[in-house]
Amino acid sequence: MARYLGPKLKLSRREGTDLFLKSGVRAIDSKCKLETAPGQHGARKGRLSDYGLQLREKQKVRRIYGVLEKQFRNYYKEAARLKGNTGENLLQLLEQRLDNVVYRMGFASTRAEARQLVSHKAILVNGRVVNVPSYVIAPEDTVVIREKSKTQARIIAALELAEQREKPTWVEVDGKKLEGSFKRLPERSDLSADINEQLIVELYSK
């Protein structure tokens, strides 16, 4: 699967937020000025047009979840097809990705690390090995670290880090057994208020 391999800190500066959650692992501020865009003229922030704001928000969310453009557009089409609020549907679809669920359960420090665990066949879903990061997790599905992967230092470190963060209410995790359950779809109030999904809906609705 294609994925972005370029400089990630530069993208975080472009969007003005810690896209890849590096600050949860190491001090990002010491090496990355999030309030300043990259480049020689990064400090000169002009007023964005409505289209510019919509595009920036789409890029931000796409990069947070590690999804390329074509796949992100497909998520939007599916969200628009479903009943209910299209923007909220979009966020729920992104939250159902296996790599995201592995991250939310605290088995990985970042979504990128979670993608690695999935791709390297370290994850069981309902008792079966799944190595597709975009695999859709449904309510009541179980996600377990494979026995031979349970001693990986990065998983142990991630669980320790997760103890310092607010725990998602839509997943249940047994840190000792290294297994979890996706209890329900997250509600909009469960997710980051820094995301304005309506801007994405406006962008794709044109």
Curated annotation (Swiss-Prot):
This is Small ribosomal subunit protein uS4. Part of the 30S ribosomal subunit. Contacts protein S5. The interaction surface between S4 and S5 is involved in control of translational fidelity. Keywords: Ribonucleoprotein, Ribosomal protein, RNA-binding, rRNA-binding. PROSITE patterns: RIBOSOMAL_S4, S4. One of its GO terms (cellular component) is small ribosomal subunit. Belongs to the universal ribosomal protein uS4 family. It comes from Pseudoalteromonas translucida (strain TAC 125). Disulfide bonds: none annotated. PANTHER family: 30S 40S RIBOSOMAL PROTEIN, SMALL RIBOSOMAL SUBUNIT PROTEIN US4M. InterPro entries: Ribosomal_uS4 (IPR022801), Ribosomal_uS4_bac-type (IPR005709), Ribosomal_uS4_CS (IPR018079), Ribosomal_uS4_N (IPR001912), S4_RNA-bd (IPR002942), S4_RNA-bd_sf (IPR036986). One of its GO terms (molecular function) is rRNA binding. One of the primary rRNA binding proteins, it binds directly to 16S rRNA where it nucleates assembly of the body of the 30S subunit. It holds the Pfam family S4. Residues 96-156 form the S4 RNA-binding domain. One of its GO terms (biological process) is ribosomal small subunit biogenesis. Gene3D superfamilies: Ribosomal Protein S4 Delta 41, Chain A, domain 1 (1.10.1050.10), RNA-binding S4 domain (3.10.290.10).
